[in-house]
Amino acid sequence: MIVTPLKHSGIHLSSGTLQRRNMPLDAVFIDSIPSGTLTPLKDLVKYQKSSLKVNGHKKNQLLEIRTSNNKDLFQSTMLSEATLPNSSLDISVIKPSMDRLRNEMIYESPGKIFQRMKAKVQRDKQEQLTRSSSMLGSPQGEHTKDFPPNTDKKAQLQQTYICEEKQTSVQSNDPSLGDPPILNQEQKNVSASCISKKALTRAQFGGQVLHSKESPVRITVSKKNTFVLGGIDCTYEKFENTDVNTISSLCVPIKNHSQSITSDNDVTTERTAKEDITEPNEEMMSRRTILQDPIKNTSKIKRSSPRPNLTLSGRSQRKCTKLETVVKEVKKYQAVHLQEWMIKVINNNTAICVEGKLVDMTDVYWHSNVIIERIKHNELRTLSGNIYILKGLIDSVSMKEAGYPCYLTRKFMFGFPHNWKEHIDKFLEQLRAEKKNKTRQETARVQEKQKSKKKDAEDKETYVLQKASITYDLNDNSLERTEVPTDPLNSLEQPTSGKERRHPLLSQKRAYVLITPLRNKKLIEQRCIDYSLSIEGISDFFKAKHQEESDSDIHGTPSSTSKSQETFEHRVGFEGNTKEDCNECDIITARHIQIPCPKSKQMLTNDFMKKNKLPSKLQKTENQIGVSQYCRSSSHLSSEENEVEIKSRTRARNTKERLNRERENTNHITKDILLISETEGERACYITPKRPRSCYITPKRPRSSAKESHYKSAVSKDFLTEGKASDRTSRQLLDHLPGLTDDEEWSEQELQKLHCAFTSLPKHKPGFWSDVAMAVGSRTADECQKKYTEEPQGQGSRKHGSKKKQANKVQNGEKDSADAKTIKITAKVGTLKRKRQMRDCLEHLAKDNHDDFFTATPLQKQRIQLPSFQYSQDDDFLLDMDRDPASPSSIITSPLRSTTPQCQHFSPSMLAAIERNNCDRYVYQMQKNAKKYGKSNGGLVWGNIRKKTVKTDLSSPPPTRKALFNKDLGKNTDISKYFIDDTESDEEEKDYYFSNSD
């Protein structure tokens, strides 16, 4: 049994009409259309009148139509002995315009209607295929709205959905009814139409129209198919065993807007939903109602399994189909297929997941939950229970970009292996350990920074310029010095030592003069004016020599800083002392009053002292100045000389101790340079009382004794020897000290090493000048290259000339200095001695005396040194034949091939010095022998020079092929006479190959 609602404006039917507005049309029944014809929609109007007369003239029609004044009418149809079609067709549903009257007919073009029909059929077929074959699901959803034309009454709609189910045959309980014959079935499409005065709508689904000759009151339900009535709630519950037994029923429309179901047998129903269709914001209730037909017999209804009702709101009712679709999709996507997948670490390096692209959807990335189980190499189960299927290989490029190691990618290249947990646990443990190490390193870095800041603050406090702490106790009346005992060890204590200052007793407290450092000239002048002091030599004192400091001097010598720190030595002499006081000599230490230098130099000094970490005693010793205090009268001028001598001895002793301590640290070469600069830069001023309550300031020149100069020279010599004997590290230190090696002249030994290394080492190899510098030992590569390119012509002559000069000095017993006078040419012309004198004279000429065109050219420093190509065994054999052409037989049989060494581009004899004496003597003998050959004898030519014959044991190899000749052939024939040598004549003996005429 199927009950269909009418199509009415404001009421939507099945899913096919969910997005369309329904317009009332006149119904055209399928019986009015001739069978076997395809009638267009525009021709269906012809059959409207005939379809209205079907109830009056045809008895085989099972439909009864009654019109009334009510606007809502329903059409009931009884189906039996047939199955429902796969899809129900809604034909020609046209959207009405709200501005016009509802009873006005509006037509669409047939082409659009046909396309809409076709699309709907295809869509319904696809939905039917996805459903279960045993039951029919509910429609997808129903979007309902109410558009009341004149009244505010709610339209009530009772919908019933059909579920097909097999059952056994049931015999009728009514004895008056016989067994009617089985009705014939015919499946046809029914077009929907609507007939009413204003807006009467009837909808008729495609079904089966039953034709029978007898009365339509008696209908026998077949054994095959029965239908169970159910509401919307049935789609969300599983059907149980339900039996529907029906003998005869009749459905007719009633005026009370509902349907009545009459039956003679017990009918078991699921439930029918009665919905109140209202505005979208109003709630729509569903309840089960079964109305009995008052005309026919009452039906007995039994509910076998009652179920609770569901209350659905308007929004939830709209989204019923969406919810059903989502549930199906969730069940469907429990097995997710991923391609181009990779492994990702999650949950703070404690678990992994897989991420990749979905196979069903393009360019959509999807990542899983925590992987807990391996089903197959490409199937995994997650913590949520879903199954992920991996397609293809792992995305190694993404894994590498994400920073995962290569071995992990290789292990999981084709999927998850059996021991995947071991690899993952090992990798995660490694990641956690690295994270802990990074955290520890960052914590240690922060602590080191804090410690360094504290140390810097302490060092700044330590090296801050301190105020002078020397006090002088003066008597107001006699202006005589009262001796205050001073401990030199206590005076050397730093103010940051934490010890309290020992204050003198109350009886010893007198007026004190505090000498504090003054930062500039104006302050000194102002202070002297305030205390009635005379000023002398301040302008000379403030002319500090500031040297430029480069970035490479960070490790180096703050000599300019030490020079700019001027040192005052305070000496206060008093008159009126007895001679007994002169015998007493107390050496007290006074702190220096330091004039501050620029901030950059102060920072350089502080950094240098931090790095070198000089002992505190050494720093204190540098600040000590021995001051001998003698009590003398106003006329004691001679005592100043003794005081100067004592001070110089004290300073020399302090310098000696400082040098001895610094020589122990041979790794720090810069300390020696610092000491030299500090010793040279010390300057001091004395404040000497000239009159009572007045004194003057005189600048003191830097004084250095013989011992100091001796130590300075020793320091410089030690520094040079260390620089020459050191390796690359010492050369790097020398590179950071500009002005030390660049200004020094090259010694003869260094020049000789330079030229020997240049000629012996291969020039085409990279790092040639570095190898030359290694051979020289005391120069860098840049210095060697610069020296060789600056003086290219005079190097060889200087080297050989110096050797020749030394040899001549040894032979003649002369001991001349380096600045010898110009050699005089005393020998006769044409002698060997004159030749040597001329050579020596030319070698000792100054370079400024003559101009060299090649040295003056601007391209002199841009000369390109061509590499000397060395023969390699990998060269082509044709080139080898060109270098040393030889026949194959000579190569095999020559005994010298194995004994003669292969000659390179130089030989060891070439590296030795050239013996000028032997060469000159040889050339001189050649010239002397040339006189023997006059023009009559042909002169001096190469043919006349006697050569020594070289005896070799070379023997010609035996011929490889012997020609067989007949022995009698030479005797019997005249061939042998052609091979007889001609006899030599006497005339040819006088003729020579070389003639004088040439």
Swiss-Prot record:
Single GO biological process annotation from the record? cell division
Positions of modified residues (Phosphothreonine): 516, 578, 688
Q: Where in the cell is it found?
A: Nucleus; Chromosome, Centromere
Keywords, ordered alphabetically:
Cell cycle, Cell division, Centromere, Chromosome, DNA-binding, Isopeptide bond, Mitosis, Nucleus, Phosphoprotein, Ubl conjugation
Residue ranges of domain SANT in the record = 741-796
Span-the-membrane segments of this chain are none
Q: In Gene Ontology terms, what is one molecular function of this protein?
A: DNA binding
Reading the lineage from the top rank, the first entry is Eukaryota
Which residues lie within the region annotated Disordered? 122-153, 438-460, 476-502, 638-660, 784-821, 976-998
Q: Where is the composition biased (Basic residues)?
A: 797-807
Q: Where is the composition biased (Basic and acidic residues)?
A: 142-153, 644-660, 812-821
Which PANTHER family does the annotation name?
MIS18-BINDING PROTEIN 1 (PTHR16124:SF3)
The entry describes its oligomerization and partners as: Interacts with SP1. Interacts with MIS18A. Identified in a complex containing MIS18A, OIP5/MIS18B, MIS18BP1, RBBP7 and RBBP4. Interacts with KAT7/HBO1. Interacts (via N-terminus) with FLNA (via N-terminus).
What is the purpose of this protein? Required for recruitment of CENPA to centromeres and normal chromosome segregation during mitosis.
* Protein name per Swiss-Prot or TrEMBL: Mis18-binding protein 1
**Organism encoding this protein:** Mus musculus
